[in-house]
Amino acid sequence: MRPAAVILAGGRSSRMGGGDKCFLPLADKPLIAHILDAVTPQTSDILINTNSDPAPFLKYGQPVLPDAIPGFQGPLAGILTGMLWSRKRHPRGVHLLTVASDVPFLPDDLVARLYHALREQRADIAIASSPEGTHPTIGLWPVDLAQRLEHDLMEGPVRSVHQWIGGFRVACAEFETIALANINTPADLAACRHHHPPDRRPAWLTGPM
């Protein structure tokens, strides 16, 4: 069974001059379109999590929700939002795929490799890793961790994904650097323009409404 997914679009990026960086163009498409093209064939359903105006996201035909817990508590709040949404929408679902909104080169076998790492390393959570380090916002999470995550976020500031997953067995799935390249600054975007994202059919155009 393919997992549901949440794209962590978060909020505005000050290092990119404000605004939602997921709409920045790369190879004639916004970053979020590249991510949807990669993730849609690998998942059963996709949620976009953002605390910005939802209107610009609606054109992509996916549900859009803000953080379930107010206070801008970072990616963990978005992950919790995805878990709660997935449990309601897919009661039999076991895992949730999480991806950041600024990684346009995600591979077509992202989910398969995360599942492989999860099984082989007998872990609770699987996250992506490259020679540059780990990428904990790109991973597979058991949706039944929602109650614990919600409790921890409500009890005190646990803003670091690395900090929170320290209490679990975590598997790392290895990828090439370019597969997980993320765009945080104008220089990052300029560097990524020297690479071409895979030429994928825009599967999200026929995705769930």
Where are each of the predicted segments found?
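Nucleotide and nucleotide-moiety/phosphate-recognizing core
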Residues: 1-158, 164-179, 187-190, 194-205
